[in-house]
Every structure is written in C-alpha cells, then in structure tokens.
Curated annotation (Swiss-Prot):
GO terms for cellular component: cytosol. It holds the Pfam family SmpB. NCBIfam families: PRK05422.1 (NF003843), smpB (TIGR00086). GO terms for molecular function: RNA binding. The keyword Endoplasmic reticulum does not apply. Its main location: cytoplasm. This is SsrA-binding protein. The gene is smpB. The keyword RNA-binding applies. It is found in: Cytoplasm. InterPro entries: SmpB, SsrA-bd_prot, SsrA-bd_prot_CS. It comes from Clostridium botulinum (strain Eklund 17B / Type B).
Length: 156
C-alpha cells in the first residue's frame, strides 16, 4: 500500500525510519539556487544516502541529489553539491553537542514547503543494529495482526 503524500511534502527519506532511531526532529531552511527550487517542486529530489555534517560552525547536507532543471541550461548547478542549512548559531552549537555523542548523526528526513520556502526536517538519529530492525518488524507485524483481529471481531 502506497502512502499518500501530503500536499506540501516534496521528498521523503523513508528508509531512514527503518535504519535509525529518530531521537528528535528539527526544522531548518536550506540555501538553494532558483533552478534547484524548481526541480524540487517538480519532485526531482532524492534524500537516499544523504546526511548532514557540521563544519566551521555551519551545517551542510551532503549527497542529496537534485536533478538538473530541464529548462535551466546555464543556470543549473551540480546535482550532488553541498547545500547549506540555515539555522541559528545556538541551534548549531546544540546540534554539534548532540551529534558528538557516539553513534549519533544528522539525517534529512523530509523536504517540504512552508510559506513558499523549501524546508528540511533534520533528525538526530542513532543507527539501528540488525536485531533492532528485526524486532521493529516483528512488532509491526504483531500490531497489524491485533488490528486485523479487532476489526474481524467488531464485524460480528
């Protein structure tokens, strides 16, 4: 079953929820070129394998692919270039402290529109082990079975 995207969600990193425990989410602006915004609005952004890195008091998203805009010709930029995130210094310092803990990283979860601006939801994540992934899959299957049984019981 395919989930219906909300109207303002432009791209989603669905695999992140399977591979990481998401401790906290933060909204950040993203510095883009005009043709990148048009391409993202057309749904040509990919968040798979992307992550955020803190360098010199700034946060950048790495390996986020935005396909070149078809009508952009000379104004198009490299699809995998680093994109700067727009956050307050205090937020950046707080995130740097959280990410410095062992096993934690910043992962972009969704790209969406808010008041005409492209925003990114960053997750402070800790990687799951294989047994954690199996446990969460078993728990989902168990919940699905319970819901199915309750629905079946309420029919009669």
């Amino acid at each position: 079953m395919v989930r219906k995207k909300s109207s303002n969600t432009l791209a989603e990193n669905r695999k992140a929820r399977h591979e990481y425990f998401i401790e906290e989410t933060i909204e950040a602006g993203i510095a883009l070129v005009g043709t990148e915004v048009k391409s993202i609005r057309n749904g040509r952004a990919n968040l798979k394998e992307s992550y955020a890195d803190i360098r010199n008091g700034e946060i950048f998203i790495l390996s986020m692919h935005i396909s070149p805009y078809e009508q952009g010709n000379i104004f198009n930029v490299e699809p995998l270039r680093e994109k700067k995130l727009l956050l307050h210094k205090s937020e950046i310092h707080r995130l740097a402290g959280l990410v410095s803990r062992d096993g934690y990283t910043l992962i972009p979860l969704t790209l969406y529109l808010k008041a005409g601006k492209v925003k990114v939801a960053l997750g402070i994540c800790k990687g799951k082990k294989d047994y954690d992934k199996r446990d969460s899959m078993l728990e989902k299957a168990h919940n699905r079975e319970m819901q199915r049984a309750l629905k079946e019981r309420s029919r009669y």
